[in-house]
Design a protein with these regions (language model features):
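Extended, low-hydrophobicity, polar/charged segments
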Residues: 1-162
């Protein structure tokens, strides 16, 4: 376990939420390769995606790194007609995080957050710790409670995926 804490870790510490911290070489940018580097099931390592709805509201979705976000399912979960990925250049000003280091924990503003229901198949899942090269492992229930997330079916092999 690493001693160099990110803001996301400090926030969990403040709420006494149990997690483990892991590092990997920051030049590894592919989520499936990150899972392999950690020696973990790629279905248990989640990426954080930020979208905007047709109503102009932002929503956050956490899905396995080996899966794609089904935009229709995401819109349904968010109660919107449609959702679209934000532009990469909008990510840091909006969330405080850069691409590859976006955590669902500790964004500049609290956005509605949804976690793919498959997370409930694991006692613990991995999410970004808020810095490229850092991951943290925690209970999906603890993550959902902390960020106010709802579990929903968010992935499929549909054509409209990201």
């Amino acid at each position: 376990m690493d001693k160099d804490k990110t803001n996301a870790m400090r926030l969990l510490d403040a709420k006494k939420i149990v997690y483990e911290s892991f590092s990997y070489p920051p030049e590894i940018t592919d989520g499936e390769l990150v899972a392999a580097q950690l020696g973990e099931d790629e279905h248990a390592v989640f990426k954080t995606l930020v979208t905007v709805t047709d109503k102009g509201e932002h929503a956050v979705f956490c899905v396995p790194v080996c899966a794609t976000l089904d935009l229709k399912r995401a819109a349904k979960a968010a109660g919107a007609k449609s959702v679209a990925m934000i532009k990469q250049k909008e990510l840091e000003p909006l969330t405080g995080y850069i691409h590859g280091g976006c955590s669902p924990i500790g964004m500049k503003k609290r956005f509605r957050t949804f976690i793919d229901e498959s997370a409930q198949n694991f006692s613990q899942i991995f999410v970004s710790a808020g810095r490229v090269g850092r991951q943290m492992k925690l209970s999906p229930a603890d993550l959902a409670k902390y960020v106010g997330a709802r579990f929903a079916p968010l992935t499929s092999d549909a054509e409209q995926t990201v």
